[in-house]
């Protein structure tokens, strides 16, 4: 009996060590990273990789939200410290709307999401959260009034004036330099993602790890912030188990 208790204790220590320093599991609850990550994807995050190397452009990272370190976000690194980011106006004839494309160091960064576009809301309420493996829910809800999404893709006053190299006629920064030790991140679903365009850069110390594989995926219903709690997180897991997406299980997450 004593041997079994010791073995169980060692297993618990090993699991805690792995989760703290090597890998942790998360569930994707929002569409901000579509089509790369879907609602109901269960991912593993490598927490050791950035102890051995620096984050690179294209890496899909989990990080502590700079405005509230208790919140975890997942986004893709678009630019690193020293990079120059510029937004170019582009008229989308298909959707009859002006959008902005992004270039890093003069090279156009292509975003391929073709899903539903949300271009015009008087009040755009954005919800984003990550579910940790233990069922804890990290969530928030932000309402941007009047200014957000009038020009999709635009940077909305997130960049300080000393870093901005160019403003457009509306006073929004459209060209800037990322400071050393910081990262500019965006969601793959550009027009439905709260990211560096709205709240600025991610400090190096906020980065927790790199997403590297979808270990399970299942179709689940979406949740409102009011519905999100540990009980509904368990319910989402049950839904996912009953409605698997076999083609996504075990899918590696390739850097762009």
From Swiss-Prot:
InterPro entries per the UniProt record, alphabetical: LexA/Signal_pep-like_sf (IPR036286), Pept_S26A_signal_pept_1 (IPR000223), Pept_S26A_signal_pept_1_CS (IPR019758), Pept_S26A_signal_pept_1_Lys-AS (IPR019757), Pept_S26A_signal_pept_1_Ser-AS (IPR019756), Peptidase_S26 (IPR019533)
Enzyme class: hydrolase
Pfam families linked to this entry: Peptidase_S26
Keyword hit for Ribonucleoprotein: no
CDD domains named among the record's database cross-references: S26_SPase_I
Cellular compartments per GO CC: membrane
UniProt EC number: 3.4.21.89
Catalytic activity field: Cleavage of hydrophobic, N-terminal signal or leader sequences from secreted and periplasmic proteins
Any GO MF annotation of the entry: serine-type endopeptidase activity
Active site: 32, 75
GO BP annotations, alphabetical order: signal peptide processing
Alphabetized UniProt keyword annotations: Hydrolase, Protease
Family of this protein: Belongs to the peptidase S26 family.
Protein name: Signal peptidase I
Protein source organism: Aquifex aeolicus (strain VF5)
Source taxonomy: Bacteria, Pseudomonadati, Aquificota, Aquificia, Aquificales
């Amino acid at each position: 009996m004593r041997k079994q208790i010791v073995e169980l204790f060692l297993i618990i220590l090993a699991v805690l060590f792995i989760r703290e320093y090597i890998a942790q599991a998360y569930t994707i609850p929002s569409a901000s990273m579509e089509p790369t990550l879907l609602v109901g994807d269960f991912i593993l995050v490598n927490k050791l990789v950035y102890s051995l190397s620096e984050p690179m452009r294209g890496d899909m990272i989990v990080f502590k939200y700079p405005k509230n370190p208790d919140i975890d976000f997942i986004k893709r690194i678009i630019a690193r410290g020293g990079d120059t980011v510029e937004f170019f106006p582009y008229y989308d004839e298909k959707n009859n709307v002006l959008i902005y494309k992004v270039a890093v160091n003069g090279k156009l960064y292509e975003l391929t999401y073709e899903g539903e576009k949300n271009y015009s809301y008087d009040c755009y309420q954005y919800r984003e959260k990550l579910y940790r493996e233990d069922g804890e829910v990290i969530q928030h809800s932000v309402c941007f009034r009047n200014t957000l999404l009038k020009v999709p893709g635009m940077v909305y006053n997130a960049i300080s004036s000393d870093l901005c190299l160019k403003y457009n006629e509306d006073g929004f920064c459209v060209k800037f330099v990322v400071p050393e030790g910081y990262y500019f991140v965006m969601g793959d679903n550009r027009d439905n993602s709260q990211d560096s365009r709205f709240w600025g850069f991610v400090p190096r110390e906020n980065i927790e790890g790199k997403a590297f594989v979808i270990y399970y995926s299942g179709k689940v219903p979406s949740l409102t912030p009011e519905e999100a709690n540990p009980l509904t997180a368990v319910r989402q897991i049950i839904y996912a188990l009953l409605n698997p997406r076999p083609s996504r299980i075990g899918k590696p997450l390739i850097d762009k």
